[in-house]
Amino acid sequence: MPRLPLLLLLLWGTGSHGFPAATSETQEQDVETVKKYLENYYNLNSNGKKVERQRNGGLITEKLKQMQKFFGLRVTGKPDAETLNVMKQPRCGVPDVAPFVLTPGKSCWENTNLTYRIENYTPDLSRADVDQAIEKAFQLWSNVTPLTFTKVSEGQADIMISFVRGDHRDNSPFDGPGGNLAHAFQPGAGIGGDAHFDDDEWWTSNFQDYNLYRVAAHEFGHSLGLAHSTDIGALMYPSYTFSGDVQLSQDDIDGIQAIYGPSQNPTQPVGPQTPEVCDSKLTFDAITTIRGEVMFFKDRFYMRTNPLYPEVELNFISVFWPQLPNGLQAAYEVADRDEVRFFKGNKYWAVKGQDVLRGYPRDIYRSFGFPRTVKSIDAAVSEEDTGKTYFFVANKCWRYDEYKQSMDAGYPKMIAEDFPGIGNKVDAVFQKGGFFYFFHGRRQYKFDPQTKRILTLLKANSWFNCRKN
């Protein structure tokens, strides 16, 4: 999620562990945000009373630490800007630390052939679109388990699905647009397994507002007995993000199969895994600078570093650019145009800030003059001082003049001619401080383009402030 500016005036005083008196309308709103969030999702019980400065301070601090640990934030017990940012994101209404229990018994269905019924429909989508979204969401889970799901049109089903607003008499009222999007109950009789969607939201079948398929797939995980996951790449992560291709992560698959076992398919599906930024084996698909920051890309994720923040930000590419595909293969910044270009296959996209420019994607043949034998770009970097962009394809490099908008004569060359010592394959590259940083596998080479010498050999994730690397 794009970072907010640093909150210079924290809600916590230096020596205080409770809420201070709010000194502005914004602070008062933030105090209320923290209070409601901890009550709803971390079992903070204020009994409807105003949270006092000292009496409940220790409990509030502990609940905040619990929340920060769950989301992988700095564990301070203080509502800093990063913590408030997470609290303000739209999310599932099921608590993170306490089970959403209304029915006694085990958190699983004894019967593997389940029924569902859509009691009513949102006006935001056609009935056919709603039916398709719900069916696809159940199919994600049936693909990896012995479970089957059959739609019924009347009577009581195992999983009842409804679109409701506000207080809908289940002790878990919705809160209007944004915030709490939906919730579902663990398996069981009565309301057990049922899923409720807030009809004050705008439900869609694309990346805008809230994608029904994405939210339904998450809620049905609860209907089947899963709790929230701390893995940001998991479908069962509590905060909402539309990642383009909705899929179960390996964490989701492991969780649901621990309850019901694997599917009966001869070939078991394998889900994507979330990168561990301090994994010494970490490799990258693409890297680029963007407005002074460095962004690393892996599968459907980006990792973002900023000299003002010690932590690495990890999230879906779609958080910044929902129109870009996953699995980007190359990227580079044209700083004087405030533009970044992303490549996948023979297509590329130009972005400015968080906006994909109109008319993209385009193909690399007409725009850059590559021959049709080039099917994709491995890596790219633009040299700020000269306006020359280097493209790396297999063991060759091409040089493109950004001012003339044409390839330079004499190219392609073997990589070793212009960049001796870095090997015959480049996975990713970027320029910073006048140096090129080349990546291949787990290795990183700091290269001086003036002397054409390697200065330092590093591990690929050396930019991430890992204690052990």
Swiss-Prot record:
EC numbers on record: 3.4.24.7
Propiece residue ranges: 19-99
Motif (Cysteine switch): 90-97
Name of one Pfam family that matches: PG_binding_1
Residues bearing attached sugar chains per UniProt: 120
Binding, Ca(2+) 2: 158, 190, 192, 194
Superkingdom in the source lineage: Eukaryota
Amino acids binding Zn(2+) 1: 168, 170, 183, 196
Compartments it resides in: Secreted, Extracellular space, Extracellular matrix
Amino acids binding Ca(2+) 3: 175-176, 178, 180, 198, 201
Signal peptide: 1-18
Ligand binding (Ca(2+) 4): 285, 329, 378, 427
Control of this protein's activity: Can be activated without removal of the activation peptide.
Disulfide bridges in this chain: 278-466
Modified residues (Phosphothreonine): 274
GO annotation terms (biological process): cellular response to UV-A; collagen catabolic process; extracellular matrix organization; proteolysis
Record's GO cellular component terms: extracellular matrix; extracellular region
Function summary: Cleaves collagens of types I, II, and III at one site in the helical domain. Also cleaves collagens of types VII and X.
Family: Belongs to the peptidase M10A family.
Domain observations: The conserved cysteine present in the cysteine-switch motif binds the catalytic zinc ion, thus inhibiting the enzyme. The dissociation of the cysteine from the zinc ion upon the activation-peptide release activates the enzyme.
Name this protein carries in UniProt: Interstitial collagenase
Organism: Bos taurus (Bovine)
